A protein has these predicted regions:
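Short polybasic amphipathic segments
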Residues: 56-60
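A short, flexible beta-alpha/helix-coil linker loop
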Residues: 63-67, 176-179, 204, 211
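Alpha-helical subdomain
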Residues: 185, 210-217, 223, 238, ...
Length: 310
């Protein structure tokens, strides 16, 4: 889970810092303190938000991955989580439980949100980094009354292939190795697995990141359109205009998406974004071809300084 910073305000392979065991026990302190631990994919750190009681930021090798508020799981800090939250809100009447598969766990921000806003939802989380998942469960536990959330360690695509057909209302792909989406989660073949897992009218959603000239985002939009008849792309206007690197949300379904409601929610958010669908999306995609496994590549790396924590 990676969020590109707004102008208004499974992770890296480089050498990880040394483990700091002295920070690896919150319960030893009256006040929350940072927790650091080496994981399979990098050095993970949980840092308390000094400005918000209960708020925690998860980083991996310095790249922001997730933000959770233990006191209020409905608080979504990052713009991409807010957009995914709006999408989930609009897919069904308020409070109706959903069956959701989360590919990519991070600190389980969205599973916590859906457990709070749609009690009774059955949610499965798949995270490739086992030590990271253990760190989050140890210090930011997500289990509680009404929270039917199971988390397992594994590869997102392999887990998706094992999901019973027609069993999910929503499949969310939010997988980053460092700051890049792995190639095997960007192809038509992968999208077909997601489509198979969904119930009729179910929705697939992916959090991605791209920058000028948006070649990756266009190719991913073409790929989703090759599998789903109804597709929308959501991003900040400056990202769509090719002015900067940022997060891109893609959603696809076999049923019409609530585009008008979604457009209103995205435009009115504290991080305003534009929804592109229909002919506008076709124009954006142009002649870009869908991506197959044979030519799939990781998403482009962010520019220097795009993801950083001081």
């Amino acid at each position: 889970m990676t969020s590109a910073p707004e102008e208004s305000d499974d992770r890296g392979e480089h050498d990880a810092p040394e483990q700091h065991d002295e920070h690896d026990a919150l319960e030893e302190h009256d006040e929350p303190v940072p927790v650091g631990r080496q994981t399979d994919l990098g050095f993970a750190k949980l840092m308390p938000d000094i400005d918000r009681d209960g708020g925690w930021l998860l980083t991996l090798d310095g790249t922001p991955q997730s933000y959770v508020d233990l006191a209020d799981p409905t608080h979504l800090e990052f713009e991409y989580t807010r957009r995914l939250g709006h999408l989930a809100d609009a897919l069904a009447p308020a409070g109706r439980p959903l069956d959701v598969l989360h590919l990519g766990g991070g600190a389980l921000t969205l599973p916590r949100y859906l457990a709070a806003t749609r009690p009774g939802s059955r949610q499965r989380v798949v995270e490739v980094d086992g030590p990271l998942l253990a760190l989050v469960e140890e210090h930011l536990p997500w289990r509680g009354p009404g929270a039917d959330v199971s988390a397992t360690v594994g590869d997102a695509r392999a887990a998706l292939a094992a999901i019973p057909a027609g069993s999910q209302d929503l499949v969310i792909a939010d997988v980053f190795h460092g700051s890049r989406t792995p190639a095997h989660l960007t192809s038509v073949e992968f999208l077909r697995l997601a489509a198979s897992a969904l119930r009729p009218g179910g929705c697939y959603a992916a959090n991605l990141a791209d920058g000028p000239p948006l070649a990756f985002a266009r190719a991913q939009a073409a790929t989703v359109r090759a599998v789903f008849p109804y597709v929308c792309l959501v991003a900040e206007a400056s990202v769509l205009r090719g002015r900067r690197y940022g997060n891109v949300l893609l959603a696809g379904s076999t049923a019409p998406l609530p585009e008008a409601e979604l457009a209103r929610l995205f435009a009115g958010d504290i991080f305003p974004a534009r929804l592109v669908a229909g002919e506008d999306l076709a124009s954006l995609v142009g002649r870009t071809a869908p991506v197959a496994d044979a030519e799939a590549t990781d998403s482009p790396p962010p520019p220097d300084g795009a993801f950083s924590v001081g």
